[in-house]
From Swiss-Prot:
The protein, known as: Pentatricopeptide repeat-containing protein At1g62260, mitochondrial
Major location (coarse): mitochondrion
Region (Type E motif): 580-655
Key words, A-Z: Mitochondrion, Repeat, Transit peptide
SUPFAM superfamilies xref list: TPR-like
Gene: PCMP-E10
PANTHER family cross-referenced by the UniProt entry: PENTATRICOPEPTIDE REPEAT-CONTAINING PROTEIN
Amino acid sequence: MIRSRSVLLIFRKVLYQSSCLKCLLCANSFSTSVSSSLGFRATNKELNQMIRSGYIAEARDIFEKLEARNTVTWNTMISGYVKRREMNQARKLFDVMPKRDVVTWNTMISGYVSCGGIRFLEEARKLFDEMPSRDSFSWNTMISGYAKNRRIGEALLLFEKMPERNAVSWSAMITGFCQNGEVDSAVVLFRKMPVKDSSPLCALVAGLIKNERLSEAAWVLGQYGSLVSGREDLVYAYNTLIVGYGQRGQVEAARCLFDQIPDLCGDDHGGEFRERFCKNVVSWNSMIKAYLKVGDVVSARLLFDQMKDRDTISWNTMIDGYVHVSRMEDAFALFSEMPNRDAHSWNMMVSGYASVGNVELARHYFEKTPEKHTVSWNSIIAAYEKNKDYKEAVDLFIRMNIEGEKPDPHTLTSLLSASTGLVNLRLGMQMHQIVVKTVIPDVPVHNALITMYSRCGEIMESRRIFDEMKLKREVITWNAMIGGYAFHGNASEALNLFGSMKSNGIYPSHITFVSVLNACAHAGLVDEAKAQFVSMMSVYKIEPQMEHYSSLVNVTSGQGQFEEAMYIITSMPFEPDKTVWGALLDACRIYNNVGLAHVAAEAMSRLEPESSTPYVLLYNMYADMGLWDEASQVRMNMESKRIKKERGSSWVDSST
């Protein structure tokens, strides 16, 4: 007996520490042979541990080979299937189980309810009605199930029939009312409670907040907070309201509530209520998040420094706050002090350095990340994509697949953007196949597909995807398709689609008008462009940005209307950038407008003194006109300033 127990312990160690399947099966075989000698408790414990470790098939094999099973053995196996939502397997065992107890019935009922949907709820109700005896868990599970499925009337009927209600029953019913928008009924029900408890109070406060009734939530908390039983749990209601205020930017109200909670349990505030009610780590974390929500990093850090007990969330929240305001030195300092880092800590450093353009440091932290998850890969792939290093983004995706990590919608969106940047139709189509095979119903992914196909020359495929999206279209979807037509110079389709967008009640954004104005520029539709520009400001109240002015200069100067173009430039509410002057200079070359070309070139040189673009454009304009002396002078000026010609630009050969 002692020998068998010792050997079984060794095999158990192998079972839970080894990844060798042969060792696992060997341990299973041995466990079966000695289960009777060790009793049900050891066997059930082993089954449970195997199921928790993900070896449910092997656990079932042991279960089938056992010479004897008790109710707990059956319940353990059924519970394993329920947790994996394999309700068919669980039901088969349930139906042949020789003797069930209330735990068996409750496990099946909660499993059906957790699966969601009316069909599973009806199965749960059938079992509930067949139960020989019910406990409060049985009733509460069914009440919650009906409430979550918007059948609040049936939930209330069960609640009223319930022989003995507890705090969970009242909480379930209050939560159900709030989830279904019947907030007043929730308040009335809470007031009917014979003995107020902190759990239903927390449920009511949370429900009021979700229904945007924060002032009422604060009143309820103030009115009943000192009267409820279970006062040590009252802090959860306060924390919920602090989070509610914080999410809505009401940081002063959040801080006022935070300060009402005693710092320490058992301080000298007096009374039993105060002794059992104090701030916990969630209170501090919630208040720090509230400050960071409004960008008050200083107040958040002061509070963080006052914390006596911090958890990983505390550190990550503060680091994330620094990352969001691009204070990477502070983020690095805090990260270096952090005692226990998790995957999120490392991912924040990767995305943080990427957001400030330091891809090298982002890559450094990525490579040092102990356990790389999908989010880790997404962060570094997105970093290279945003930095326009599309090839490295693709190489990382290939490595991600080799290392066995599956892509998600964020991965595919970045890769589709990389395909667009590389103008690589084949790569984009491969990404599209992954989307189809994984059946990812993600709007941003499909938006990226529309852009990718249009930029790679397959505008018809873009339109096919756009048409298939139908009711799932958002403003970005319309922008992508209109932008695709504009990119291809198809102004009529772009403008027609813009009209459909408005008739479908989709409010255009500033990006929409950039695409519309670009479409007008491609087609030389000056009057249409002016009308759309005016409409953008007067009808949609969108303030013109640099891109809009650049497009308007492009369309007017492109049609030889240089006075109009200069009027637009001089009347802009901000200094024109290189895109504006570049559009004018391009038009000057087409129309041989030497005087205005000099103005545009000089303006571009002031903005980017080391750029060769204005010199090359000016040189080529003189060359086109046969003015070789002037062209040579431009080249000499450029060489005297030691400006090197950028890759991709070329001189017109003087020998031709």
